From Swiss-Prot:
Subunit field text: The 20S proteasome core is composed of 14 alpha and 14 beta subunits that assemble into four stacked heptameric rings, resulting in a barrel-shaped structure. The two inner rings, each composed of seven catalytic beta subunits, are sandwiched by two outer rings, each composed of seven alpha subunits. The catalytic chamber with the active sites is on the inside of the barrel. Has a gated structure, the ends of the cylinder being occluded by the N-termini of the alpha-subunits. Is capped at one or both ends by the proteasome regulatory ATPase, PAN.
Active site feature: T9
Transmembrane segments annotated in the record for this chain: none
Protein activity control: The formation of the proteasomal ATPase PAN-20S proteasome complex, via the docking of the C-termini of PAN into the intersubunit pockets in the alpha-rings, triggers opening of the gate for substrate entry. Interconversion between the open-gate and close-gate conformations leads to a dynamic regulation of the 20S proteasome proteolysis activity.
InterPro entries, per database record: Ntn_hydrolases_N, Pept_T1A_Psome_bsu_arc, Pept_T1A_subB, Proteasome_bsu_CS, Proteasome_sua/b, Proteasome_suB-type
Record's protein name: Proteasome subunit beta
Catalysis: reaction(s): Cleavage of peptide bonds with very broad specificity
Family: Belongs to the peptidase T1B family.
NCBIfam families: arc_protsome_B
The keyword Hydrolase appears for this protein: yes
EC numbers, comma separated: 3.4.25.1
Primary gene name: psmB
Record key words, sorted: Autocatalytic cleavage, Cytoplasm, Hydrolase, Protease, Proteasome, Threonine protease, Zymogen
GO cellular component, one term: proteasome core complex, beta-subunit complex
Length: 211
């Protein structure tokens, strides 16, 4: 059943001087029907690595499980975490191998090793690194916010507010995006940390945005 569900999704990842911040909203849609109001689209796949999903839910969930297993095996065998660029390459190669019967997904991989990284990966395995990236039907609205307000020297606190504003802008204009916002901060010190919903709600109110 999940293989038939498409997420009209908005996801975003940004790099800062010493962190990566990733965020998504929660609405899951099938054409014009809201199938789920609390879908999970933001995942920790390694100690210092996160992944967001957009596209067919079943395809995306399989890829998340696969990546978690591969990265855990790598860590157990080598006693180090896989570099973020290698994570993106592994996922890219896997998708490219099945490009004629593709996983219908758009993915972001973000994390920190010697420096922060965000990669956008398409269904054919195309992988592009950038200082920020967004996927899903709401991404044009996210890019509008990021183009005008992003600065890599933002503090982590300012970066969290920025991704919340970006996702909120998409929710206002994209009918396939909605619900609560999930945010994760990835640093060398603390690894992957997903912020509590209560903290996100408080920030949304402080910024004068609509829940």
């Amino acid at each position: 059943m999940n293989q038939t569900l498409e997420t009209g999704t908005t996801t975003v990842g940004i790099t800062l001087t010493d962190a990566v911040i990733m965020a998504t909203e929660r609405r899951v849609t099938m054409e014009n029907f809201i199938m789920h109001k609390n879908g999970k689209k933001l995942f920790q796949i390694d100690t210092y690595t996160g992944m967001t999903i957009a596209g067919l839910v079943g395809d995306a969930q399989v890829l998340v499980r696969y990546m978690k297993a591969e990265l855990e095996l790598y860590r157990l065998q080598r006693r180090v975490n896989m570099p973020i660029e290698a994570v993106a390459t592994l996922l890219s190669n896997m998708l490219n191998q099945v490009k004629y019967m593709p996983y219908m997904v758009q993915l972001l991989v973000g994390g920190i090793d010697t420096s922060p990284h965000v990669f956008s990966i398409d269904a054919a395995g195309g992988s592009v690194e950038d200082i920020y990236a967004s996927t899903g039907s709401g991404s044009p609205f996210v890019y509008g916010v990021l183009e005008s307000q992003y600065n890599e020297k933002l503090s982590i606190d300012e970066g969290v507010d920025l991704v919340i504003r970006a996702i909120s802008a998409a929710k206002q204009r994209d009918s396939a995006s909605g619900g609560m916002i999930d945010v994760a901060v990835i640093t060398k010190k603390d690894g992957y940390v997903q912020l509590p919903t209560e903290q996100i709600e408080a920030r949304i109110k402080k910024l004068g945005l609509i829940l």
